């Protein structure tokens, strides 16, 4: 990519070509806001949510920093908790707003629009925005995952996926499948109404199995390989998971209760089950409550509904100061 740019030269060249042909372009980046991190250059710390163990996302159009978990927000003039200055924060990384700023700088005569849950209004304004996109009046769409959800754009001929590596290394057994599905859906938007659609994927990991499968259109081979690896690891859809989330004020109380649950589970003496944890969850705090999780894994698909497990879960006595939730085959592991 050029200096101070988040969009590579090949992508810029293809957008230029599309504009010359009066074709529509979609730039896909599954990251809301302007930048995912605000960093104080004086103190070398990031701006974090006061309620959750997450970083605040800079939303330039709303003049604020926002937590995407609990909704907490502060003004863009907020001061660093350490140096008490509001002048040292710099945005790190791109979001759709930042990409739009770059597009406006590169192609000042092109009409562009962000397509995300933050920017897309409801009611009549939503219909007007959709009409502008469908008619081709909007030259360049900059969209998050929302754009992959069944929308059809007749004039769209070019799709460019920015930062395709995002999420490929997340600690989730479904991450490769999820990434493949989303990118496949997005690039499938190009040329849906014609045969000359084009798709570009901007990546630092071109040899990654997901991206190679997309490049070579080897979807069936990729999914079969993925299934074989899941079977070998005894994870869904071959095995099953139950996630137990404990939340409360004190981590030590949650860990102690988690150990108690683990001992209770061991006392059931079940075959083909494993239990992991208790451990602090990847997002360790949400809405000022600490989170601890246990994970139960079954080697066989039928075992998770075993009556002993159901009865044990139903009869757990939870202390008043702990919130307890059960998620069978969790889709997210935060």
Regions found by a protein language model. Give the residues of each.
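Short, aromatic/basic amphipathic alpha-helical patches
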Residues: 213-215, 308-314
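A common structural junction motif
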Residues: 262-271, 311-322
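Glycine-rich loop/hinge motif
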Residues: 331-334
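Inter-lobe coupling/hinge segments of SF2-like helicase ATPases
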Residues: 1-255, 263, 267, 271, ...
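Short, intrinsically disordered low-complexity segments
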Residues: 277-303
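Short beta-strand elements
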Residues: 113, 269-281, 320-329
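Short, conserved charged micro-motifs
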Residues: 251-257, 300-311
């Amino acid at each position: 990519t050029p200096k101070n740019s988040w969009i590579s030269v090949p992508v810029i060249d293809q957008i230029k070509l599309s504009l010359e042909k009066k074709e529509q372009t979609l730039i896909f980046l599954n990251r809301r806001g302007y930048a995912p991190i605000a960093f104080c250059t004086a103190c070398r710390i990031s701006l974090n949510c006061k309620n959750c163990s997450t970083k605040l996302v800079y939303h330039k159009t709303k003049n604020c920093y926002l937590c995407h978990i609990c909704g907490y927000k502060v003004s863009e003039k907020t001061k660093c908790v350490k140096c008490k200055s509001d002048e040292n924060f710099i945005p790190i990384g791109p979001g759709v707003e930042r990409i739009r700023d770059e597009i406006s700088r590169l192609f000042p005569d092109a009409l562009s629009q962000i397509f995300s849950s933050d920017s897309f209004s409801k009611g009549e304004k939503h219909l007007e925005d959709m009409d502008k996109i469908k008619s081709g009046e909007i030259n360049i769409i900059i969209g998050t995952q929302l754009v992959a959800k069944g929308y059809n754009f007749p004039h769209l001929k070019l799709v460019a996926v920015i930062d395709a590596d995002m999420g490929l290394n997340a600690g989730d057994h479904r991450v490769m499948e999820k990434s493949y599905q989303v990118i496949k859906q997005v690039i499938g938007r190009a040329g849906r109404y014609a045969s000359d659609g084009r798709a570009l994927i901007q990546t630092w990991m071109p040899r990654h199995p997901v991206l190679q499968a997309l490049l070579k259109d080897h979807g069936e081979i990729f999914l079969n390989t993925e299934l074989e690896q899941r079977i070998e690891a005894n994870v869904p859809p071959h095995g099953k998971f139950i996630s137990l989330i404990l939340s409360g004020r004190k981590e030590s109380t949650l860990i102690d209760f988690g150990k108690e649950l683990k001992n209770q589970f061991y006392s059931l003496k079940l075959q083909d089950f494993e239990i992991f944890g208790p451990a602090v969850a990847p997002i360790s705090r949400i809405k000022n409550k600490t989170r601890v999780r246990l994970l139960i894994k079954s080697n066989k698909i039928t075992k998770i509904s075993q009556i002993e497990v159901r009865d044990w879960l139903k009869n757990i006595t939870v202390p008043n100061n702990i919130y307890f939730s059960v998620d069978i085959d969790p889709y997210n592991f935060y």
